[in-house]
């Protein structure tokens, strides 16, 4: 069945060239997110009407970034920029089905948590040959949040873990979550009249990412220490990844006339290791995309595009790294809309600041 829901990632950017050498930028984006729910009859869905919880395993994660950047342009070629990042995170995870054993019926919910980080980068351009290159580093951001946790299976009378869960839930502590650091490299150059080639390479430090809610962690440690999960004697995480993610996109863009332009691109993503979490059961992807851009006047444009993804096959595991299933032959489609305006004659596009999150 289809377990992935539709979701969108809005992005907005504003750049003001305050003086010949100094600029200010404001960027809003949603760097990470998830929206998925299992349905139908499977080991990820609880259909037993006797139990006090029903439905399918699901995850919803929302993050938002507001970036305030300051740029210094010593000449027409170089741009040095850095700034602060205000980030919010909230999420819901519901585990359902026999796959999760004693965690069947577990709920994890957070309110919106706020934290601050930073980013910095450098850009270089040669306008005469349409060359633009930039490197942007985004630092990790740590969040500490009070989360709601509930172990639904232990509400069943005579459940053997009910006394232990009662002890665990009588205390509480902060749940820590750190969104990963990343590096973006963008490059563009003219290859013939009105035609450019472009490329992007991105690295995300997912191998250090983990989510272990406080009460979830305490129960997992008990299970590991009592040899109930022999391969995890120190407990396990609700979500973690084995490897860092590397992705790349290459393409060609062409200006057909004063009003119309277009592009085609090919993309590849390594994923973050295999096996993967049941809450995001894919290992990377290949993609192809195309887009068009219409400029009714010199000072604004409208762009649209579509991209098709072949999602990588993956073996899914639970937090305890027990086998949960194999996911194969999956795909996805993405649509994009882009609108831009130039407010002054020396206003330049915020490409030098761009950090696709």
Q: Model regions: which residues?
A:
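Outer-membrane beta-barrel porins/channels
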Residues: 8-11, 17-357
